[in-house]
Protein backbone atom coordinates (compact mmCIF):
# COMPACT_ATOMS: atom_id res chain seq x y z
CA UNK A 1 0.00 0.00 0.00
CA UNK A 2 2.96 2.36 0.54
CA UNK A 3 4.26 1.51 -2.93
CA UNK A 4 4.99 4.48 -5.20
CA UNK A 5 2.71 4.33 -8.25
CA UNK A 6 3.30 7.77 -9.77
CA UNK A 7 5.91 10.54 -9.75
CA UNK A 8 5.20 13.74 -11.64
CA UNK A 9 7.21 16.98 -11.80
CA UNK A 10 6.34 20.38 -13.21
CA UNK A 11 7.96 23.78 -13.62
CA UNK A 12 6.49 26.42 -11.27
CA UNK A 13 7.67 29.87 -10.15
CA UNK A 14 9.41 30.83 -6.92
CA UNK A 15 9.06 34.04 -4.92
CA UNK A 16 11.41 35.92 -7.26
CA UNK A 17 9.51 34.89 -10.38
CA UNK A 18 12.14 32.34 -11.39
CA UNK A 19 11.29 28.77 -12.38
CA UNK A 20 11.73 25.94 -9.91
CA UNK A 21 10.78 22.27 -9.66
CA UNK A 22 7.65 20.93 -7.98
CA UNK A 23 7.14 17.18 -7.57
CA UNK A 24 4.03 15.11 -6.79
CA UNK A 25 4.35 11.55 -5.48
CA UNK A 26 1.32 9.24 -5.27
CA UNK A 27 1.22 5.91 -3.41
CA UNK A 28 -0.90 2.82 -4.02
CA UNK A 29 -2.98 3.68 -0.94
CA UNK A 30 -3.86 7.07 -2.43
CA UNK A 31 -1.48 8.89 -0.06
CA UNK A 32 0.06 11.92 -1.73
CA UNK A 33 3.07 14.18 -1.22
CA UNK A 34 4.00 17.44 -2.94
CA UNK A 35 7.24 19.39 -2.59
CA UNK A 36 8.59 22.55 -4.22
CA UNK A 37 12.33 23.19 -4.33
CA UNK A 38 13.80 26.53 -3.16
CA UNK A 39 16.65 28.45 -4.82
CA UNK A 40 19.41 30.68 -3.46
CA UNK A 41 20.73 34.11 -4.54
CA UNK A 42 24.08 33.98 -2.75
CA UNK A 43 25.14 30.41 -3.46
CA UNK A 44 28.24 28.64 -2.19
CA UNK A 45 30.71 27.28 -4.72
CA UNK A 46 30.55 23.88 -3.01
CA UNK A 47 26.76 23.46 -3.19
CA UNK A 48 25.07 20.67 -5.11
CA UNK A 49 24.17 21.73 -8.65
CA UNK A 50 20.81 23.34 -9.28
CA UNK A 51 20.15 22.30 -12.88
CA UNK A 52 19.05 25.15 -15.17
CA UNK A 53 18.31 24.80 -18.89
CA UNK A 54 20.46 27.70 -20.09
CA UNK A 55 18.01 28.41 -22.94
CA UNK A 56 18.06 32.22 -23.14
CA UNK A 57 14.77 32.24 -25.06
CA UNK A 58 12.93 30.96 -21.95
CA UNK A 59 13.05 32.64 -18.54
CA UNK A 60 16.43 34.19 -19.45
CA UNK A 61 18.07 30.79 -19.32
CA UNK A 62 16.71 29.90 -15.87
CA UNK A 63 14.15 27.30 -16.96
CA UNK A 64 14.16 23.90 -15.25
CA UNK A 65 12.58 21.73 -17.94
CA UNK A 66 15.63 19.44 -18.02
CA UNK A 67 15.32 18.77 -14.29
CA UNK A 68 11.57 18.21 -14.72
CA UNK A 69 12.26 15.79 -17.58
CA UNK A 70 14.75 13.91 -15.39
CA UNK A 71 12.07 13.39 -12.74
CA UNK A 72 9.31 12.43 -15.16
CA UNK A 73 11.61 10.14 -17.11
CA UNK A 74 14.65 8.46 -15.61
CA UNK A 75 13.85 8.96 -11.91
CA UNK A 76 10.18 7.97 -12.17
CA UNK A 77 11.03 4.86 -14.19
CA UNK A 78 13.48 3.77 -11.51
CA UNK A 79 11.44 4.60 -8.40
CA UNK A 80 7.88 3.59 -9.30
CA UNK A 81 7.37 0.35 -7.37
CA UNK A 82 9.61 1.40 -4.45
CA UNK A 83 8.23 1.52 -0.90
CA UNK A 84 7.92 5.21 0.02
CA UNK A 85 8.84 4.48 3.63
CA UNK A 86 12.32 3.40 2.50
CA UNK A 87 13.61 7.00 2.41
CA UNK A 88 17.31 6.17 2.71
CA UNK A 89 17.16 3.57 -0.04
CA UNK A 90 15.26 5.91 -2.37
CA UNK A 91 17.68 8.78 -1.83
CA UNK A 92 20.71 6.52 -2.29
CA UNK A 93 19.24 5.13 -5.49
CA UNK A 94 18.84 8.64 -6.95
CA UNK A 95 22.36 9.65 -5.88
CA UNK A 96 23.80 6.53 -7.52
CA UNK A 97 21.73 7.14 -10.66
CA UNK A 98 23.14 10.65 -10.89
CA UNK A 99 26.69 9.36 -10.55
CA UNK A 100 28.37 12.75 -9.97
CA UNK A 101 29.78 14.19 -6.72
CA UNK A 102 27.53 17.28 -6.93
CA UNK A 103 24.31 15.90 -8.47
CA UNK A 104 25.19 17.73 -11.67
CA UNK A 105 23.73 15.20 -14.11
CA UNK A 106 20.13 14.90 -12.89
CA UNK A 107 20.22 18.10 -10.83
CA UNK A 108 19.92 18.55 -7.07
CA UNK A 109 16.62 20.35 -7.71
CA UNK A 110 15.24 17.19 -9.37
CA UNK A 111 16.53 14.80 -6.70
CA UNK A 112 15.47 16.97 -3.75
CA UNK A 113 11.97 17.52 -5.10
CA UNK A 114 11.45 13.76 -5.28
CA UNK A 115 13.13 13.15 -1.91
CA UNK A 116 10.88 15.58 -0.02
CA UNK A 117 7.70 14.60 -1.86
CA UNK A 118 8.36 10.93 -1.03
CA UNK A 119 8.75 11.81 2.67
CA UNK A 120 5.48 13.76 2.62
CA UNK A 121 3.63 10.92 0.92
CA UNK A 122 5.02 8.42 3.43
CA UNK A 123 4.00 10.71 6.32
CA UNK A 124 0.46 10.85 4.96
CA UNK A 125 0.45 7.07 4.49
CA UNK A 126 1.44 6.53 8.13
CA UNK A 127 -1.12 9.15 9.23
CA UNK A 128 1.51 11.37 10.83
CA UNK A 129 2.48 15.01 10.36
CA UNK A 130 5.79 15.36 8.54
CA UNK A 131 7.70 16.53 11.64
CA UNK A 132 6.62 13.42 13.55
CA UNK A 133 7.30 11.04 10.66
CA UNK A 134 10.85 12.38 10.19
CA UNK A 135 11.70 13.13 13.82
CA UNK A 136 9.85 10.46 15.77
CA UNK A 137 8.27 10.89 19.19
CA UNK A 138 11.10 13.10 20.50
CA UNK A 139 10.35 15.89 17.98
CA UNK A 140 8.89 18.63 20.14
CA UNK A 141 11.24 21.67 20.21
CA UNK A 142 9.90 24.79 18.48
CA UNK A 143 12.76 26.88 17.07
CA UNK A 144 13.73 30.45 17.89
CA UNK A 145 13.19 32.42 14.68
CA UNK A 146 16.00 34.46 13.14
CA UNK A 147 13.90 37.21 11.59
CA UNK A 148 15.58 39.11 8.79
CA UNK A 149 14.22 42.64 9.11
CA UNK A 150 16.87 44.63 7.19
CA UNK A 151 18.18 43.21 3.92
CA UNK A 152 21.43 44.13 2.19
CA UNK A 153 24.01 42.47 -0.02
CA UNK A 154 22.67 40.17 -2.74
CA UNK A 155 19.16 40.34 -1.28
CA UNK A 156 18.56 44.04 -1.89
CA UNK A 157 19.36 46.95 -4.20
CA UNK A 158 21.06 49.12 -1.59
CA UNK A 159 24.65 49.88 -0.51
CA UNK A 160 24.65 47.72 2.66
CA UNK A 161 27.44 45.11 2.47
CA UNK A 162 26.08 42.74 5.12
CA UNK A 163 23.26 40.67 3.70
CA UNK A 164 20.95 40.15 6.67
CA UNK A 165 20.24 41.92 9.95
CA UNK A 166 18.10 39.67 12.12
CA UNK A 167 16.31 39.68 15.46
CA UNK A 168 15.95 36.64 17.74
CA UNK A 169 13.13 36.83 20.32
CA UNK A 170 14.60 34.47 22.91
CA UNK A 171 12.46 35.68 25.83
CA UNK A 172 9.18 34.52 24.28
CA UNK A 173 7.28 31.78 26.10
CA UNK A 174 6.32 30.00 22.88
CA UNK A 175 6.67 30.32 19.13
CA UNK A 176 3.38 32.22 18.78
CA UNK A 177 4.68 34.89 21.13
CA UNK A 178 8.06 34.96 19.36
CA UNK A 179 6.34 35.62 16.04
CA UNK A 180 4.21 38.36 17.63
CA UNK A 181 7.29 40.04 19.13
CA UNK A 182 9.03 39.93 15.76
CA UNK A 183 6.01 41.37 13.99
CA UNK A 184 5.77 44.25 16.46
CA UNK A 185 9.45 45.14 15.99
CA UNK A 186 9.10 44.83 12.20
CA UNK A 187 6.20 47.30 12.07
CA UNK A 188 7.94 49.66 14.50
CA UNK A 189 11.05 49.57 12.30
CA UNK A 190 8.95 50.52 9.28
CA UNK A 191 7.76 53.65 11.08
CA UNK A 192 11.28 54.51 12.23
CA UNK A 193 12.75 54.15 8.75
CA UNK A 194 9.97 56.22 7.20
CA UNK A 195 10.50 58.93 9.83
CA UNK A 196 14.21 58.92 8.93
CA UNK A 197 13.41 59.54 5.28
CA UNK A 198 14.29 56.02 4.11
CA UNK A 199 12.25 53.95 1.70
CA UNK A 200 10.45 50.97 3.16
CA UNK A 201 10.55 48.73 0.12
CA UNK A 202 11.32 45.11 0.92
CA UNK A 203 14.02 42.72 -0.26
CA UNK A 204 13.87 39.10 -1.39
CA UNK A 205 13.28 37.80 2.12
CA UNK A 206 10.70 40.34 3.23
CA UNK A 207 12.95 42.64 5.24
CA UNK A 208 13.31 46.34 4.54
CA UNK A 209 15.97 47.43 2.08
CA UNK A 210 16.69 51.08 2.95
CA UNK A 211 19.55 53.03 1.39
CA UNK A 212 21.58 52.88 4.58
CA UNK A 213 25.30 52.55 3.87
CA UNK A 214 26.57 51.86 7.38
CA UNK A 215 26.24 48.58 9.26
CA UNK A 216 26.12 50.46 12.55
CA UNK A 217 23.34 52.75 11.35
CA UNK A 218 21.27 49.69 10.43
CA UNK A 219 21.93 48.15 13.85
CA UNK A 220 21.03 51.40 15.60
CA UNK A 221 17.68 51.55 13.80
CA UNK A 222 16.94 47.98 14.87
CA UNK A 223 17.90 48.62 18.51
CA UNK A 224 15.70 51.70 18.61
CA UNK A 225 12.80 49.76 17.10
CA UNK A 226 13.15 46.94 19.64
CA UNK A 227 13.01 49.48 22.47
CA UNK A 228 10.08 51.42 21.00
CA UNK A 229 8.18 48.15 20.57
CA UNK A 230 8.51 47.68 24.34
CA UNK A 231 11.35 45.14 24.51
CA UNK A 232 14.91 45.14 25.85
CA UNK A 233 17.75 44.50 23.39
CA UNK A 234 20.16 41.93 24.76
CA UNK A 235 17.55 40.57 27.15
CA UNK A 236 14.24 39.98 25.37
CA UNK A 237 15.56 40.14 21.82
CA UNK A 238 19.09 39.61 20.51
CA UNK A 239 20.63 40.42 17.13
CA UNK A 240 22.10 38.15 14.47
CA UNK A 241 23.98 38.89 11.24
CA UNK A 242 24.46 37.05 7.98
CA UNK A 243 27.49 38.69 6.41
CA UNK A 244 27.49 36.44 3.30
CA UNK A 245 31.09 37.64 3.12
CA UNK A 246 32.05 35.37 0.23
CA UNK A 247 30.12 37.84 -1.94
CA UNK A 248 32.56 40.67 -1.12
CA UNK A 249 35.77 38.66 -0.67
CA UNK A 250 37.83 39.68 -3.69
CA UNK A 251 41.51 39.06 -4.28
CA UNK A 252 42.12 37.98 -0.69
CA UNK A 253 40.48 41.08 0.84
CA UNK A 254 37.03 41.84 2.22
CA UNK A 255 35.94 44.69 -0.06
CA UNK A 256 33.10 46.39 1.81
CA UNK A 257 32.18 49.04 -0.75
CA UNK A 258 29.24 50.44 1.19
CA UNK A 259 31.50 51.01 4.19
CA UNK A 260 34.48 52.09 2.10
CA UNK A 261 36.65 49.40 3.71
CA UNK A 262 39.17 46.93 2.31
CA UNK A 263 40.04 44.47 5.06
CA UNK A 264 42.46 41.59 5.51
CA UNK A 265 41.13 38.44 7.17
CA UNK A 266 42.49 39.57 10.55
CA UNK A 267 41.04 43.07 10.12
CA UNK A 268 37.67 41.58 9.17
CA UNK A 269 37.67 39.51 12.37
CA UNK A 270 38.50 42.62 14.41
CA UNK A 271 35.69 44.50 12.63
CA UNK A 272 33.16 41.81 13.59
CA UNK A 273 34.50 41.58 17.14
CA UNK A 274 34.01 45.34 17.56
CA UNK A 275 30.39 45.03 16.42
CA UNK A 276 29.80 42.24 18.95
CA UNK A 277 31.34 44.37 21.69
CA UNK A 278 29.00 47.28 20.94
CA UNK A 279 25.75 45.46 20.11
CA UNK A 280 23.91 42.41 21.53
CA UNK A 281 24.88 40.17 18.61
CA UNK A 282 24.70 36.45 19.45
CA UNK A 283 25.04 34.90 16.01
CA UNK A 284 27.14 35.65 12.91
CA UNK A 285 26.71 33.64 9.73
CA UNK A 286 29.46 33.46 7.11
CA UNK A 287 31.57 36.06 8.88
CA UNK A 288 34.45 34.86 6.69
CA UNK A 289 34.45 33.66 3.09
CA UNK A 290 33.81 30.02 2.17
CA UNK A 291 37.47 29.18 1.48
CA UNK A 292 39.12 31.59 3.94
CA UNK A 293 39.92 28.84 6.45
CA UNK A 294 42.59 30.97 8.11
CA UNK A 295 40.08 33.77 8.66
CA UNK A 296 37.52 31.32 10.02
CA UNK A 297 40.07 29.98 12.50
CA UNK A 298 40.90 33.51 13.68
CA UNK A 299 37.19 34.33 14.01
CA UNK A 300 36.44 31.13 15.94
CA UNK A 301 39.36 31.63 18.31
CA UNK A 302 38.31 35.22 18.97
CA UNK A 303 34.51 34.94 19.24
CA UNK A 304 33.59 31.24 19.30
CA UNK A 305 33.20 31.02 23.08
CA UNK A 306 30.45 33.65 23.22
CA UNK A 307 28.96 34.03 19.73
CA UNK A 308 27.32 31.43 17.50
CA UNK A 309 29.43 31.30 14.31
CA UNK A 310 27.32 29.76 11.57
CA UNK A 311 28.81 28.15 8.49
CA UNK A 312 26.60 28.44 5.42
CA UNK A 313 28.76 28.79 2.30
CA UNK A 314 31.51 27.25 4.44
CA UNK A 315 29.70 23.94 5.01
CA UNK A 316 26.87 23.95 2.41
CA UNK A 317 25.04 21.31 4.52
CA UNK A 318 27.64 18.82 3.30
CA UNK A 319 28.91 16.17 5.77
CA UNK A 320 32.36 16.15 4.12
CA UNK A 321 32.78 19.93 4.37
CA UNK A 322 31.42 19.86 7.92
CA UNK A 323 33.87 17.12 8.93
CA UNK A 324 36.70 19.25 7.54
CA UNK A 325 35.50 22.22 9.60
CA UNK A 326 35.14 20.19 12.79
CA UNK A 327 38.69 18.85 12.43
CA UNK A 328 40.02 22.36 11.78
CA UNK A 329 38.15 23.76 14.78
CA UNK A 330 36.31 26.42 12.79
CA UNK A 331 32.80 27.77 13.37
CA UNK A 332 30.45 26.22 15.93
CA UNK A 333 27.20 26.00 14.01
CA UNK A 334 25.88 24.80 10.65
CA UNK A 335 23.18 26.39 8.53
CA UNK A 336 20.92 23.67 7.16
CA UNK A 337 19.60 24.20 3.63
CA UNK A 338 18.11 21.09 2.09
CA UNK A 339 18.85 22.18 -1.47
CA UNK A 340 22.56 22.70 -0.79
CA UNK A 341 23.09 18.96 -0.43
CA UNK A 342 20.04 17.83 -2.39
CA UNK A 343 18.35 15.03 -0.43
CA UNK A 344 16.55 14.58 2.87
CA UNK A 345 18.77 11.67 3.93
CA UNK A 346 22.01 13.62 3.46
CA UNK A 347 20.53 16.64 5.22
CA UNK A 348 19.67 14.55 8.29
CA UNK A 349 23.15 12.98 8.22
CA UNK A 350 24.76 16.43 8.27
CA UNK A 351 22.50 17.60 11.12
CA UNK A 352 23.39 14.50 13.14
CA UNK A 353 27.12 14.97 12.52
CA UNK A 354 26.94 18.61 13.66
CA UNK A 355 24.96 17.64 16.74
CA UNK A 356 27.48 14.96 17.73
CA UNK A 357 30.31 17.49 17.38
CA UNK A 358 28.33 19.87 19.64
CA UNK A 359 27.76 22.29 16.80
CA UNK A 360 24.33 23.91 16.71
CA UNK A 361 22.08 23.67 13.65
CA UNK A 362 19.96 26.43 12.09
CA UNK A 363 17.26 25.28 9.67
CA UNK A 364 17.07 27.71 6.77
CA UNK A 365 15.06 28.86 3.78
CA UNK A 366 16.56 30.28 0.56
CA UNK A 367 15.98 33.73 -0.92
CA UNK A 368 13.94 32.13 -3.72
CA UNK A 369 11.13 30.37 -1.84
CA UNK A 370 7.62 29.06 -2.47
CA UNK A 371 4.54 28.38 -0.36
CA UNK A 372 6.10 25.02 0.61
CA UNK A 373 6.60 24.98 4.40
CA UNK A 374 8.64 21.77 4.70
CA UNK A 375 11.51 23.44 6.57
CA UNK A 376 9.20 24.33 9.47
CA UNK A 377 8.49 20.62 9.93
CA UNK A 378 12.18 19.74 9.55
CA UNK A 379 13.18 22.32 12.18
CA UNK A 380 10.91 20.59 14.69
CA UNK A 381 11.78 17.09 13.45
CA UNK A 382 15.48 17.69 14.15
CA UNK A 383 14.93 19.65 17.41
CA UNK A 384 17.53 22.06 16.05
CA UNK A 385 16.14 24.97 18.08
CA UNK A 386 16.61 27.70 15.47
CA UNK A 387 15.03 28.58 12.13
CA UNK A 388 15.88 31.22 9.60
CA UNK A 389 12.95 31.91 7.31
CA UNK A 390 12.89 35.60 6.53
CA UNK A 391 10.92 38.56 7.72
CA UNK A 392 7.36 39.22 8.82
CA UNK A 393 6.10 39.92 5.31
CA UNK A 394 5.72 38.01 2.03
CA UNK A 395 3.52 34.93 2.08
CA UNK A 396 6.43 32.68 1.05
CA UNK A 397 8.10 33.53 4.39
CA UNK A 398 4.96 33.60 6.51
CA UNK A 399 3.97 30.13 5.29
CA UNK A 400 6.77 28.74 7.46
CA UNK A 401 5.89 30.82 10.54
CA UNK A 402 2.24 29.85 10.21
CA UNK A 403 3.19 26.18 9.97
CA UNK A 404 5.23 26.50 13.19
CA UNK A 405 2.14 27.93 14.92
CA UNK A 406 0.12 24.92 13.71
CA UNK A 407 2.78 22.45 14.84
CA UNK A 408 2.96 24.05 18.29
CA UNK A 409 -0.82 23.77 18.58
CA UNK A 410 -0.66 20.13 17.44
CA UNK A 411 1.99 19.29 20.05
CA UNK A 412 0.00 20.93 22.84
CA UNK A 413 1.50 20.63 26.32
CA UNK A 414 4.58 18.68 25.19
CA UNK A 415 5.73 21.54 22.93
CA UNK A 416 8.92 23.27 24.07
CA UNK A 417 10.16 26.64 22.79
CA UNK A 418 13.96 26.66 22.51
CA UNK A 419 14.18 30.23 23.84
CA UNK A 420 17.25 31.10 25.89
CA UNK A 421 18.66 27.57 25.63
CA UNK A 422 20.30 28.58 22.34
CA UNK A 423 22.41 31.32 23.95
CA UNK A 424 26.15 30.83 24.29
CA UNK A 425 26.42 33.55 26.96
From Swiss-Prot:
GO MF annotations, alphabetized: magnesium ion binding; phosphopyruvate hydratase activity
Active site: 205 (proton donor), 337 (proton acceptor)
UniProt-listed Enzyme Commission number(s): 4.2.1.11
Name the UniProt record assigns to this protein: Enolase
Keywords: Cytoplasm, Glycolysis, Lyase, Magnesium, Metal-binding, Secreted
Cystine crosslinks: none
Localization: Cytoplasm; Secreted; Cell surface
UniProt cofactor(s): Mg(2+)
UniProt gene name: eno
PROSITE patterns per record: ENOLASE
Amino-acid positions noted as binding Mg(2+) in the UniProt annotation, renumbered to this chain: 242, 285, 312
Entry annotated with the keyword Secreted: yes
Catalytic activity line of the entry: (2R)-2-phosphoglycerate = phosphoenolpyruvate + H2O
Stated family: Belongs to the enolase family.
Annotated residues for binding of (2R)-2-phosphoglycerate: 163, 337, 366-367, 388
Source species, domain of life: Bacteria
Function: Catalyzes the reversible conversion of 2-phosphoglycerate (2-PG) into phosphoenolpyruvate (PEP). It is essential for the degradation of carbohydrates via glycolysis.
Pfam family, one: Enolase_C
Species of the source: Cereibacter sphaeroides (strain ATCC 17023 / DSM 158 / JCM 6121 / CCUG 31486 / LMG 2827 / NBRC 12203 / NCIMB 8253 / ATH 2.4.1.)
Chief site of localization: cytoplasm
Keyword Amino-acid biosynthesis: no
Pathway membership: Carbohydrate degradation; glycolysis; pyruvate from D-glyceraldehyde 3-phosphate: step 4/5
